[in-house]
UniProtKB/Swiss-Prot annotation:
Component of the cap-binding complex (CBC), which binds co-transcriptionally to the 5' cap of pre-mRNAs and is involved in various processes such as pre-mRNA splicing and RNA-mediated gene silencing (RNAi) by microRNAs (miRNAs). The CBC complex is involved in miRNA-mediated RNA interference and is required for primary miRNA processing. In the CBC complex, CBP20 recognizes and binds capped RNAs (m7GpppG-capped RNA) but requires ABH1/CBP80 to stabilize the movement of its N-terminal loop and lock the CBC into a high affinity cap-binding state with the cap structure. GO terms for cellular component: cytoplasm; nuclear cap binding complex; nucleus. This is Nuclear cap-binding protein subunit 2. The modification Phosphoserine is found at S245. The gene is CBP20. It comes from Arabidopsis thaliana.
Length: 257
């Protein structure tokens, strides 16, 4: 009986729930299969890497990568189909536990690939083991899916709380007039905040008024100067003022003498 359990442990470390037969039929399928299941694979391991590694055990018929059923990207497992049973046994014997992309891969006998088994069975699309994993594994998407959802929910709560406080700007104080309790300046503090601006605005109004007054005075002065010039009588060339001398004056003095 002990040898039977030992033989079972050698054939496979897990039982596929999708196998519809009995345990005896499952064990018989494992003994005759030329397919191996590879687990604990990095999401970034390529089909070419797997082919290079498993071709050392024998001639490979086909490699089928396990994919996330939602994103259609590798999700950490694959199937390798050999042509002979001997090569299949060598792969399990010599390659299981090999370090590939800095992680030990697991190689088990498989009862045979069927269409649909290439998709992950987890609720999030990947493998079930990655749903409940609590450790951080950068080669397999970081934390497990449930932990990622919890972290995302916490982040959204933090973002929502920050947004509710910072999304709406604080309303500026309204000027209700200069009442006895501070009025529009909200008391002494309001004067400290707004008094400087009021001073500059008043100074600017005074400067503008002073400039307009100067301009008006200059304009009035020029107008009065022009008016005085216009009102001053023009000299008649026929009349002379005292002290003037010309030839007609000399003629008068000659006649008197």
């Amino acid at each position: 009986m002990a040898s039977l359990f030992k033989e079972q442990a050698k054939l496979s470390a897990y039982r596929d729930r999708r196998f519809s037969g009995t345990q005896e039929e499952f064990d018989e399928a494992l003994r005759a299969s030329t397919t191996v299941y590879i687990g604990n694979v990095s999401f970034y391991t390529t089909e070419e890497q797997l082919y290079e590694l498993f071709s050392r055990a024998g001639e490979i018929k086909k490699i089928i990568m396990g994919l996330d059923k939602n994103t259609k990207t590798p999700c950490g497992f694959c199937f390798v189909l050999f042509y002979s049973r001997e090569d299949t046994e060598d792969a399990v014997k010599y390659i299981s536990g090999t370090i590939l992309d800095d992680r030990p891969i697991r190689v088990d006998f498989d009862w045979g690939f069927q269409e649909g088994r290439q998709w992950g069975r987890g609720r999030s699309g990947g493998q079930v083991r990655d749903e409940y994993r609590t450790d951080y594994d950068p080669a397999r998407g970081g934390y497990g899916k449930l932990v990622q959802k919890e972290l995302e929910a916490q982040r959204q709560l933090v973002d929502y709380g920050t947004g509710s406080l910072g999304a709406y700007p604080q309303a500026a104080p309204t000027n209700y007039g200069n009442g006895r309790r501070g009025g529009g300046n909200y008391g002494q503090g309001g004067q400290n905040r707004h008094g400087r601006g009021d001073y500059h605005r008043k100074r600017q109004r005074d400067d503008d008024r002073y400039g307009r007054d100067n301009s008006r005075r200059n304009t009035d002065h020029e107008s009065r100067r022009d008016t005085d010039s216009d009102m001053r009588p023009e000299k008649n060339p026929r009349f002379r003022e005292s002290g003037d001398s010309d030839d007609d004056g000399e003629d008068d003095r000659k006649r008197r003498s």
